[in-house]
């Protein structure tokens, strides 16, 4: 169980009020709005809200090299393990293609519960967004905990 909790902790994509773009980086408005909806849904533990942003086939490669599905992560969220203080998203790269956008950067946060609770965590990430019939959806994420202080 703690393995999945640690994996899910590495997944949270954004809390919009604390996102920072590196100089010269442009975020497509639709994806910026989707990050905002995702952050709001994650903070509220709103599974249906998360499902509107994460594609049905969403997968994440977590820090311990385990691949989790959308529903795996939502199950951990619903058990109340995805709470953070001082969450910041630093976006360093956005690569746009007609049907796909890659967003890279790193998150910093202090987990309230679970692995790393009470310590500052730095987590590089890569998010893959795809244009689907429902709009832009997050289809894949890689997140690695690089540093804990």
What are these regions (language model features)?
Residues 1-7:
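Bacterial N-terminal signal peptides that target proteins for export
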Residues 20-52, 59-149:
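A beta-strand edge to alpha-helix "cap/lid" segment located at domain peripheries
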Residues 7-8, 19:
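Intrinsically disordered and other compositionally biased segments
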Residues 14-16:
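N-terminal signal peptide c-region/cleavage motif recognized by signal peptidases
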């Amino acid at each position: 169980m703690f393995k999945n909790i640690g994996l899910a902790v590495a997944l949270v994509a954004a809390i919009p009020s604390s996102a920072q773009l590196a100089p010269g980086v442009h975020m497509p408005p639709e994806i910026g709005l989707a990050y905002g909806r995702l952050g709001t849904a994650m903070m509220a533990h709103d599974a249906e809200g998360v499902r509107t942003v994460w594609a049905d086939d969403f997968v994440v490669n977590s820090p311990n090299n385990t691949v989790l599905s959308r529903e795996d992560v939502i199950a951990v969220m619903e058990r109340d393990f995805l709470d953070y203080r001082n969450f910041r998203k630093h976006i360093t790269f956005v690569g746009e293609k007609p049907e796909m956008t890659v967003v890279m950067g790193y998150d910093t946060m202090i987990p309230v519960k679970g692995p790393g609770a009470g310590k500052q965590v730095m987590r590089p990430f890569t998010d893959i967004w795809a244009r689907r019939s429902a709009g832009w959806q997050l289809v894949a994420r890689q997140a690695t905990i690089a540093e804990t202080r």
